[in-house]
């Protein structure tokens, strides 16, 4: 764990084995840049990292005056430093003008600290020869790199303490999600997922209810049960319900997550290459667990319910089949034409369960469609729903948090593609196009009229698990949805 220590001193007077200097917007003339000639000799142009070994200074470029690039560069700095022999590093306080607003200083500090904290993460549980990082401490000298505008009116020390608290909570929450999503399916079963949720509940004094297949049968959650049929004897399903109840709650929010601990496609079997990484199909449910940890520790004034449908989707003699017709908890019949469109079946029943709680807002998270990745790329999540104001709020607050999001629109023509001749709805579209939206429209079939304007669907299929380093994310799971939804909840409560 990397410790960040705040010190009321100048950057020059702070003591550490190494100095970290960000070159913002190719500004090589700043007083903290000690050897401009050396940088020119090696043609360092303010991008990537460069180590001045003699002066023990690591220079890291921030391409533009942008808080998100500052976060990314801070992460790159720690990734570079963990390969070196320094135990401690010092850094000043940087502010970027792009997002200069009333809380500009706070947002810049959050970005700096979160980038630093996330830089050490690596999923190495199964590596026998782990390389422990020597880097243990970052000394933050509470001196501004440049003059801060009047929008940075709060005291530097107060803002730094608040930002550090946020970064520590968010790092812990993201890493809970990352570890869970990265866990291989031989370990990361529905029961294991429930155990992780129980640990989070115990630490945060949350209510938790873990329900088995008997409960699902009682509640007539037949769509959920169908997906688990092939795994029932070995890895039975779990409906996990976490509850955070503060003394004062302005809103009741339900967060619903798809928790497919492994998805081979069922009888509509995936090609072998497509099965690899399907441990990540629990990304939505894992995000909900991480969110409960974050929101509870931040002490948000909302009653938050986290609902996770955890199951496998496998093959076997008992597996559900194409041509089956399922009767969901909501009472609607579903024609199954593809067993690999299973996440939406689990979510349909979980969303029905969530609506029974009468929440003010419902947000579901799922690695739902490959079509979303094709349309938006692997770094961007999709937002769907009916309420434009709610969608816009999630998008703007999510983007400010550093996640990439884009809205996808429902339309009546795509809705026709999930019609069935023999049931209320079909679980797969009759067209190969618009698959991310038709999946969202399928879920819409299970949202009651009174909740249509209270519901958002977030497809995190792209960024939940990426097989390379990007932004502040290491190879594998990213914790997609956690930062965005935390920011969304905070903004939602400001309007309450």
Curated annotation (Swiss-Prot):
GO terms for biological process: proteolysis. The keyword Metal-binding applies. Gene3D superfamilies: Leucine Aminopeptidase, subunit E, domain 1, Zn peptidases. Signal peptide: none annotated. The keyword Nucleotide-binding does not apply. Mn(2+) 2 binds at residues 258, 263, 281, 342. Its main location: cytoplasm. It catalyses: Release of an N-terminal amino acid, Xaa-|-Yaa-, in which Xaa is preferably Leu, but may be other amino acids including Pro although not Arg or Lys, and Yaa may be Pro. Amino acid amides and methyl esters are also readily hydrolyzed, but rates on arylamides are exceedingly low; Release of an N-terminal amino acid, preferentially leucine, but not glutamic or aspartic acids. It is found in: Cytoplasm. Presumably involved in the processing and regular turnover of intracellular proteins. Catalyzes the removal of unsubstituted N-terminal amino acids from various peptides. This is Cytosol aminopeptidase.
